[in-house]
Structure formats: structure tokens, C-alpha cells
């Protein structure tokens, strides 16, 4: 890890790949959730790249029994 790298658990946003590892949810499932919830407050589109707001997505997951 480079000195300028921010640990994944401190990042504000995560890529689909990072979120998949962090939340232990498949990449395809996360892409599908993003596609189905385009206006969700936990989602940011950076061009065509999906970014997930970590803390807000954690709150969503806390309320769910299953994904």
C-alpha cells in the first residue's frame, strides 16, 4: 500500500470491485442493484463508472434481511 492510499474502510466511495470485496456481495449483484436504483442516495455515477457511497450503503444493508 502506498503512503497516499486510503484504506478501504475509510474511503467515502467504493468502486463496484472494492464494494464487492468489502460487503461480500457479488459484482454482478451490485451492478444490478445500481441499475435498478439509479437515483439512490448511495450511488454516484462518475461518467460511466459506478461509485458506491460506503456509509450510506452500509445503512441500507443494515435495514435488510436479504439482498
Curated annotation (Swiss-Prot):
GO terms for biological process: DNA integration; DNA recombination; provirus excision. Gene3D superfamilies: 3.90.105.50. The keyword Ribonucleoprotein does not apply. It holds the Pfam family Tn916-Xis. The keyword Signal does not apply. It comes from the Bacteria. Keywords: DNA integration, DNA recombination, Transposable element, Viral genome excision. This is Excisionase from transposon Tn916. It comes from Streptococcus agalactiae serotype V (strain ATCC BAA-611 / 2603 V/R). The gene is xis.
Amino acid at each position: 500500500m502506498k503512503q497516499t492510499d486510503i484504506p478501504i474502510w475509510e474511503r467515502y466511495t467504493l468502486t463496484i470491485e472494492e464494494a464487492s470485496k468489502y460487503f461480500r456481495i457479488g459484482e454482478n449483484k451490485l451492478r444490478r442493484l445500481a441499475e435498478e436504483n439509479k437515483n439512490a442516495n448511495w450511488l454516484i455515477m462518475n461518467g460511466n463508472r459506478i461509485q458506491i457511497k460506503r456509509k450510506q450503503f452500509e445503512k441500507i444493508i443494515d435495514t435488510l434481511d436479504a439482498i
